[in-house]
Amino acid sequence: PFVRDEMTSPTPVSSTATEQTATQTTEDEADIVGAVGKTKEAVVSVTNLQSSFQGTDQETGAGSGVIYKKDGNKAYVVTNYHVVEGASRLSVTLSDGTALEAKVLGEDPTYDLAVLSIDSSKVTQVAKLGDSDTLRAGETVLAIGNPLGIFANSVTRGVISAQERTVPVDTNKDGQQDFNTEVIQTDAAINLGNSGGALINTAGQLIGINSMKIAEASVEGVGFAIPINEALPIMRDLEQNGEVVRPQLGIQIRDVQEFPSGYREDRLKLPDDVTKGIVVVGLTRNSGAEKAGMKANDVIVEINGKAIASFADLKSVLYRDAKVGETVKVTFYRGGEKQTADVKLSAQSPTVQ
């Protein structure tokens, strides 16, 4: 017998639901467009010009920057240190194409930040600062910059992948990772030339300075930005003082693991379970460490209760949690015995910690 196929009728789609979805999408897009509009003109291109053998200035690199302050006839731009490093002259190009000479007010290789000043007469927008401490994983963010040095004010969209990621970096280019940088991780595309550009939230607030990207073929969607709450105190120091004055113990050090096992056992006399720390190899005369009674071959394992496993840990604890003039409790081993010393911190010199 002939059997008739039973066709299932399609479920009616509510026109109201469709309208709501379309409205929601439009509202989301409006938020994004509005956020970009609040910041886009505050993002600039930064061109690094260096003297050639012929005596002329040649462009050696380009990056991005963000105008974060306007005061009288000056406007202030934050960018990455590596964008301006070695420049004999800097040019800042505004969003409308106006090129201005820029002056470096201060540089900080440790955090990869620099502050520039430019003439403010053509500046039409200043970035509004947000609060990077309130970021949540999954939150929508936008990166604005100058990718490849030729596509000014490009916008990419992504999310916060992680709000407190620690990335080891080599600040003095000696091949050793000597500082742990706390960064925002995002999957918003951050390409060559985006360095120094803005990472903003959907309110159009600056929440990070785009900095590093893991440049490996096998890694996609991994970009980093310096949280604005980390960057702001440094920006202020660079703007006002031209440098960041950081605290030091007054010691020269090496990581425990740089020493052969025989030296660790015979000279340092470390317990078997102590495999990480930093070894004092010298002290600055009249430094806080010397006055506190510390000596060569002391092995530091904690400062104010925070573990010190490496040079990078020491710098992170001192730079983030301490100030010049404060006293910190240093826990160390001497001759196999665990001891503590209260060390008053002084202003850092280039070769001492």
Where are these regions (language model features)?
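Short, conserved beta-turn/loop elements at beta-strand boundaries and strand-helix junctions
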Residues: S51, K70-G72, E107-Y111, A162-V169, ...
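C-terminal recognition in membrane/secretory proteostasis and scaffolding
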Residues: P1-P10, K103, R136, N201, ...
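A conserved glycine-rich beta-strand in the N-terminal activation segment of trypsin-fold
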Residues: T26-G34, Q50-Y76, T98-E101, Q125-K128, ...
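Active-site loop architecture of trypsin-fold serine endopeptidases
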Residues: Q50-E59, A87-L90, T124, I144-R157, ...
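Gly/Ser-rich catalytic serine loop of serine hydrolases
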Residues: G61-S64, V126-D131, V183-A198, V280-K291
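N-terminal activation segment of mature serine protease catalytic domains
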Residues: F2-T56, S64, R89, R236, ...
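Conserved active-site neighborhood of the chymotrypsin/trypsin-like protease fold
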Residues: I67-I150, I308-F311, V317, G325-K329, ...
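Terminal peptide-recognition signature
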Residues: E41-T47, G65, A75-T79, A102, ...
